[in-house]
UniProtKB/Swiss-Prot annotation:
Deleted gene: phenotype: Early flowering and bolting at room temperature (22 degrees Celsius), lost sensitivity to heat and accumulation of FT, associated with reduced levels of TAS1-siRNAs. Attenuated immunity leading to an increased susceptibility to the pathogenic bacteria Pst DC3000 (avrRpt2), with slightly reduced induction of ICS1 and salicylic acid (SA) levels upon pathogen infection.
UniProt xrefs under InterPro entries: SGS3, XS_domain, XS_domain_sf, Znf-XS_domain
Chief subcellular location: cytoplasm
The protein's name: Protein SUPPRESSOR OF GENE SILENCING 3
PANTHER family registered for this protein in UniProt: PROTEIN SUPPRESSOR OF GENE SILENCING 3
Upper lineage: Eukaryota, Viridiplantae, Streptophyta, Embryophyta, Tracheophyta
Tree of life domain: Eukaryota
Gene name linked to the record: SGS3
C-alpha cells in the first residue's frame, strides 16, 4: 500500500502548506548524491540509493457508512468497506498490508511496537526523524560536461572492473611480444594518468571526441555504430560496432593490441559511468539476463491461521470489570469470511478488548484470513492504524481493527491465560503450509479438470453408444418381428402345401389303386373266359361222343387234348408276355422315380442357393467370407 498511498499523501501535504513531514519525505527519497572525487579532481562519485522504510505522519479518517438500522456497538468491516476511506494513505513498508508476507516483514522490523501491551490506552510513539544529509546536496558541476551528465541508479562496480582489468593486464603481459608492443606504439604505464589524459591518447582522442559530442540518448541509439579505435590500421579496423558490442570486443580481444583494447575498455567503461550511461560490468557476457534468486524466501506464520480483532470491549459492569463482544457476535460481524471459531482475551480487569478469529488449518483458510487482513488494511483498519492513529469510536459506535496474528500477538493474547485456557498455536513454514499446498491444489485442480473432461467425453461417448444401441435394438426388434411373421407365414404355407401334397398323393394313390383294380378285374375276367372256353370245348366233345364208334371217341379225345395243349401253350405265351410287360413297367417306374428324385434334388439345391442369396442380401454373411 505504501507504493500506492505515498504519492497521494505527498500531494495532500504540499497543498496544505509547508510541513516538517514534507522535508522528511524529501530526505527519505534522496537516494543519490554527487561528490567530488579525491583522485581525479572533479569526477562524479555515484552513490546507490538505499530504501528507508519508516512510518509517516499522514493521518486518515475512518468514515462509517450511514445505515437506517439501529446502531451497533462496534463499527465492523461491513461499515468501512463501502465508505470513502482516507486512511488508505498509510505509509506501510514492504509489499503492503495486502498479504501476510509483507505484514510478517513489517512486524519483525518493528520490535518496539510489538513489545508493548495491546490495550486501548496505548498511544503510538512519534515517528523517528532522520537527520538531514551531511552538507546538503553536494552539487559540483564541471565545465563542458554538465550538459551530458545524468545520475542513474546502478550498482557500484568500478572496483571490480579495475581489479579485473589489472588481472587481465597481468595475463596479457605474458602473451604480448615485443613486436606487438612496438607496433602498438603505446605507453602501458598509465597508473599515474588521469581519466582525461587517458582519453587524450592518440589512439582514443578522435573516438572520445566524437563520443563527447553526443548525448546519452544518441549514444544508446541502436543504429549508431563506431570503428574500434584500438584496431586502427590493423585487422578488424573496418568492422562496425554498437556501444555495448564495442565494449565487449575491447574486453575480449585476444590477438594483437590486447593491452590497448583492455585500456580502451577501462576508459570507455569509466567514461560511460561518469556520464550515467548503462554499463555492463567487466567479466559478464553481453546479452546475459539476471532474474530472481533461485532460493525461495520463506518465513514462519502462525498455524492455524488467525486474525487479531482489536477494540472488542464495550463497557464496565457493576464490579468495575470490562465486558466485551461474545464469540457468536464476533463471528456474525465477519460472517462473510469462513472463520471457524472466535476467542477473546481476558485479564484481571475483565475483557481486554483483544479477540481472535480462527480459520481452517489449510491453505484455503490462510487465504481467507489473508483476504480479511487485506480488506481491513485497504480500509485503514490494520495494525499500523491501530498502533498510530486509532479511532476508538466512529459514528457513535466502536470501530473494530484487525490484522494477521503473529507469535508476539498471541503471546500477548495468552498473557493472563493458564493451562487449557491458553490459545494453542504453532509456527509453520509459509512455503510448506501455503505455497506447496496451493501448488498441490492447483495440480489437483488440473487433474480434476482433466478427469472431468475425460469423464465428459466418456459420458458423451456412452450416450452416443446408448443411442446407437437403442436404434440397433429397435431395428433388431423390428427384424425379429418381421422374421417371426415370415416364419409364421412360411409355416402356414408349408402346412397348406403339405395338405395339398397329401391330397395329391391320396388322389394319385386312389387313381393307381383303381387302375390296379381294373387291371386285376380284367385279368380275372380273362382267366374266367379261358376256363369257360375250355369247359365249353370239353362239354361239346362229351356230347358228341358215340359209344358205338370207338374210333370217333378216340378221335374226339385227341382233338380235346390238342385243344387243351394249344390253350395251355397260349397261356404260357400270355404269361411270358405279361411278365415282360410287368418288367418293362417296373423299369419305366424306376426310371421315372430316378428322374423324380433328381428333379427333387435339383429343386432343393436351387432352393438352397436362392435362400443363401437372400440371406446375403439381408446382411447375414458367412464367417468364412
Amino acid at each position: 500500500m505504501s507504493s500506492r498511498a505515498g504519492p497521494m499523501s505527498k500531494e495532500k501535504n504540499v497543498q496544505g502548506g509547508y510541513r516538517p513531514e514534507v522535508e522528511q519525505l524529501v530526505q527519505g527519497l534522496a537516494g543519490t548524491r554527487l561528490a567530488s572525487s579525491q583522485d581525479d579532481g572533479g569526477e562524479w562519485e555515484v552513490i546507490s540509493k538505499k530504501n528507508k522504510n519508516k512510518p509517516g505522519n499522514t493521518s486518515g479518517k475512518t468514515w462509517v457508512s450511514q445505515n437506517s438500522n439501529p446502531p451497533r456497538a462496534w463499527g465492523g468491516q461491513q461499515q468501512g468497506r463501502g465508505s470513502n476511506v482516507s486512511g488508505r494513505g498509510n505509509n506501510v513498508s514492504g509489499r503492503g498490508n495486502g498479504n501476510g508476507r509483507g505484514i510478517q516483514a513489517n512486524i519483525s522490523g518493528r520490535g518496539r511496537a510489538l513489545s508493548r501491551k495491546y490495550d486501548n490506552n496505548f498511544v503510538a510513539p512519534p515517528p523517528v526523524s532522520r537527520p538531514p544529509l551531511e552538507g546538503g546536496w553536494n552539487w559540483q558541476a564541471r565545465g563542458g560536461s554538465a550538459q551530458h551528465t545524468a545520475v542513474q541508479e546502478f550498482p557500484d562496480v568500478e572496483d571490480d572492473v579495475d581489479n579485473a582489468s589489472e588481472e587481465e593486464n597481468d595475463s596479457d603481459a605474458l602473451d604480448d611480444s615485443d613486436d606487438d608492443l612496438a607496433s602498438d606504439d603505446y605507453d602501458s604505464d598509465v597508473s599515474q594518468k588521469s581519466h582525461g589524459s587517458r582519453k587524450q591518447n592518440k589512439w582514443f582522442k578522435k573516438f572520445f571526441g566524437s563520443l563527447d559530442s553526443l548525448s546519452i540518448e544518441q549514444i544508446n541509439e541502436p543504429q549508431r555504430q563506431w570503428h574500434c579505435p584500438a584496431c586502427q590500421n590493423g585487422p578488424g579496423a573496418i568492422d562496425w560496432y554498437n556501444l555495448h558490442p564495442l565494449l565487449a570486443h575491447a574486453r575480449t580481444k585476444g590477438a594483437r593490441r590486447v593491452k590497448l583494447h583492455r585500456e580502451l575498455a577501462e576508459v570507455l567503461e569509466k567514461d560511460l559511468q561518469m556520464r550515467g550511461a548503462s554499463v555492463i560490468p567487466c567479466g559478464e557476457i553481453y546479452g546475459q539476463w539476471k532474474g530472481l534468486g533461485e532460493d525461495e524466501k520463506d518465513y514462519e506464520i502462525v498455524w492455524p491461521p488467525m486474525v487479531i480483532i482489536m477494540n472488542t470491549r464495550l463497557d464496565k459492569d457493576d464490579n468495575d470489570k470490562w465486558l466485551g463482544m461474545g464469540n457468536q457476535e464476533l463471528l456474525e460481524y465477519f460472517d462473510k469470511y469462513e472463520a471457524l471459531r472466535a476467542r477473546h482475551s481476558y485479564g484481571p480487569q475483565g475483557h481486554r478488548g483483544m479477540s481472535v478469529l480462527m480459520f481452517e488449518s489449510s491453505a484455503t483458510g490462510y487465504l481467507e484470513a489473508e483476504r480479511l487482513h487485506r480488506e481491513l488494511a485497504e480500509m485503514g483498519l490494520d495494525r499500523i492504524a491501530w498502533g498510530q492513529k486509532r479511532s476508538m469510536f466512529s459514528g457513535g459506535v466502536r470501530q473494530l481493527y484487525g490484522f494477521l496474528a503473529t507469535k508476539q500477538d498471541l503471546d500477548i493474547f495468552n498473557q493472563h491465560s493458564q493451562g487449557k485456557t491458553r490459545l494453542k498455536f504453532e509456527l509453520k513454514s509459509y512455503q510448506e503450509m501455503v505455497v506447496k499446498e496451493l501448488r498441490q491444489i492447483s495440480e489437483d485442480n488440473q487433474q480434476l479438470n482433466y478427469f472431468k473432461n475425460k469423464l465428459s467425453k466418456q459420458n458423451k461417448h456412452a450416450k452416443v453408444l446408448e443411442e446407437s444401441l437403442e436404434i440397433m435394438s429397435e431395428k433388431l426388434r423390428r427384424t425379429a418381428e418381421d422374421n417371426r411373421i415370415v416364419r409364421q407365414r412360411t409355416k402356414m404355407q408349408h402346412e397348406q402345401n403339405r395338405e395339398e401334397m397329401d391330397a395329391h398323393d391320396r388322389f394319385f394313390m386312389d387313381s393307381i389303386k383303381q387302375i390296379h383294380e381294373r387291371r386285376d378285374a380284367k385279368e380275372e375276367n380273362f382267366e374266367m373266359l379261358q376256363q369257360q372256353e375250355r369247359a365249353k370245348v370239353v362239354g361239346q366233345q362229351q356230347q358228341n361222343i358215340n359209344p358205338s364208334s370207338n374210333d370217333d371217341c378216340r378221335k374226339r379225345a385227341e382233338e380235346v387234348s390238342s385243344f387243351i395243349e394249344f390253350q395251355e401253350k397260349e397261356m404260357e405265351e400270355f404269361v411270358e408276355e405279361r411278365e415282360m410287360l410287368i418288367k418293362d413297367q417296373e423299369k419305366k417306374m424306376e426310371d421315372m422315380k430316378k428322374r423324380h428324385h433328381e428333379e427333387i434334388f435339383d429343386l432343393e439345391k436351387e432352393f438352397d442357393e436362392a435362400l443363401e442369396q437372400l440371406m446375403y442380401k439381408h446382411g447375414l454373411h458367412n464367417e468364412d467370407d
